[in-house]
């Protein structure tokens, strides 16, 4: 059995102390740096809104010009044990649509055959349009929604 010499023991102590000091310094950086996952934000083009138990994410209104029809694109989650009817209303008389969100599911309004089309959009692409989402369980939830042109990955979303 070999016994460490004094210089070897000193090197081990110094290495351990350097490791502990470095770990403490690196861990301390996290204290003053906020974690991005602590902040809620919309990472896509659209906005998020909750209508009672329904969770709408990445909501946008696809339309090429003011006065033209528009398609509402969004992912809608229903975590409840019952189907929920969701109404979407835009500006103007009779400018609304309704879709049923099945229980325990998430659907994409623009992809899953549940296309929601409004007859008239009162805002130009690049601006915000006021839409009201409503359900019997939650009442009305007005929200400003970005209007995007039917180009790029929205090219297939024409009324």
Locations of regions flagged by a protein language model:
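Intrinsically disordered, low-complexity Pro/Gly/Ser/Thr-rich segments with frequent PxxP/GP/PP motifs
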Residues: 91-120
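Asparagine-centered strand-capping/turn motif at beta-strand->loop junctions
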Residues: 74-80
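Bacterial signal peptide processing site
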Residues: 30-33
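N-terminal edge beta-strand
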Residues: 49-63
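Short, solvent-exposed loop/turn segments enriched in Ser/Thr/Gly
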Residues: 67-73, 122-130
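Short, hydrophobic/aromatic beta-strand segments
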Residues: 69, 82-89, 143-145
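C-terminal motif of bacterial Sec signal peptides marking the signal peptidase cleavage site
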Residues: 24-28
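Extracytoplasmic/periplasmic copper-protein system
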Residues: 36-49, 140-142, 147-159
